[in-house]
C-alpha cells in the first residue's frame, strides 16, 4: 500500500475557514429561515471593474480567431503585464524592480506556499501570532516543523506575538531566524507598519542573512501616505526580501485568479557546501516545471487594472470597502467595543467582550443575530480573545450587521 505524507497528520483537525463553514451550515440547517450575514472570509462581493471586463471580453474574442488565438503562454507571465506591474507598482514608488523580477501567478496563497519548493527544509522560521494560517500549514505539510503542541502551536517555529501591548507590531526575534513571514497591512489584525519600523526588519535580515517573505496583498487599501506599499521602498530590501502581491482584493479577482511574486535577482541562498546560489533561477525553474502560467484572457484583465479607467474603477472599489470598514469601526467603537484596524486595511480586529473566548463569541453572534465573523484564535494562540470582521460585503449588509451586533 502506498505511504502517505505523514506531515499532513500533524495538521490541526480543520483549516479555519472550512470549520467556520461547517458551523454555519449546521446552524442554517437547524434554522431554515435564518438571514445570515457573512463578514468572515475575506472574499470580495462587488462586480469586477468594467475596464477589466471589457479587456477580458476583447481577449476572449481574439481567442476565437485564427490570428488571435493563444495557446500556452510564458510561465512567468506575458511581458506586457509584467512591464505594467513594474512601472505602476514599483518604479512609480522609487523601487527599482524590473519586469524580469516579476512572476505572474494564479494567487498569492499558492505562491506563499510554493516558495518553499526552492528553500531548504532546515531553515529556521518565524511567523507572527496571530497569522494567516497558510504560512504555518504549508510549513507543516512540507516537514519544516515538529509536532503540534496542546496549545495549537508547532515545535520548531518561532512565534512573534502581535497584540495591544506592542501596537500589533512584532518584536525582532531574539535569536537568528532564517525565514521571516511578514504581512502588512496585516491579515488578520489590520495593523500597518511604517518605514522606520520596516527598516528594522530589513536591517535584521541583512545582518543575519535572513530572507523576508513579505505579503503585501492588501497594500492597495493603504490610506496613509507615510505607510510603505512595498518592502522595496526600504533600502537593502532587494537583497533580503521576496514580495507577494495579488489582484484579488483590489480588483476583485478572487474568482478570476491573478497575482504576482517579486524575486529580485540580488537574492541569494546557500547550498549545503556553503556555495552562494541565486534564488531567481531556482524560482524560474520551479515555475517552468510546475506551473503552466495564467491564461491570456485573465492577464489582459489584470493589465486593464493599470489603464486610466481601470485605476479609477479600482479606486472606487477600494473606497467602497474602506467606507464599509469605517462604518463598522465607528459603530462598534460607539457601542463600547475595543476595535483595531480598519484604517488602512479592510479588516476590523475586535477585542471580544466579557472575557468570552473567540469561538464562544463566534457562536454567540451566529446564534443571537446571524452574523458570521472569524475567531481570532483561528489565526493563532495570541489571537484568542479577538475577533475579525471583514469589510468585504454590500453596504446594506454591513449596516444591517452592525445594527444587529450593537443592539444585542
UniProtKB/Swiss-Prot annotation:
Pyridoxal 5'-phosphate binds at residues 72, 108-109, 132, 187, 218, 246-248, 257, 292. Substrate binds at residues 15, 42, 109, 132, 187, 292, 388. It comes from Prochlorococcus marinus (strain MIT 9301). InterPro entries: Aminotransferase_I/II_large (IPR004839), DapL/ALD1 (IPR019942), PyrdxlP-dep_Trfase (IPR015424), PyrdxlP-dep_Trfase_major (IPR015421), PyrdxlP-dep_Trfase_small (IPR015422). Involved in the synthesis of meso-diaminopimelate (m-DAP or DL-DAP), required for both lysine and peptidoglycan biosynthesis. Catalyzes the direct conversion of tetrahydrodipicolinate to LL-diaminopimelate. HAMAP family: DapL_aminotrans_1. This is LL-diaminopimelate aminotransferase. The keyword Transferase applies. Keywords: Aminotransferase, Pyridoxal phosphate, Transferase. Its cofactor is pyridoxal 5'-phosphate. Pathway: Amino-acid biosynthesis; L-lysine biosynthesis via DAP pathway; LL-2,6-diaminopimelate from (S)-tetrahydrodipicolinate (aminotransferase route): step 1/1. Belongs to the class-I pyridoxal-phosphate-dependent aminotransferase family. LL-diaminopimelate aminotransferase subfamily. It catalyses: (2S,6S)-2,6-diaminopimelate + 2-oxoglutarate = (S)-2,3,4,5-tetrahydrodipicolinate + L-glutamate + H2O + H(+). GO terms for molecular function: L,L-diaminopimelate aminotransferase activity; pyridoxal phosphate binding. Its EC number is 2.6.1.83. SUPFAM superfamilies: PLP-dependent transferases. Homodimer. One of its GO terms (biological process) is lysine biosynthetic process via diaminopimelate, diaminopimelate-aminotransferase pathway. Pfam families: Aminotran_1_2 (PF00155).
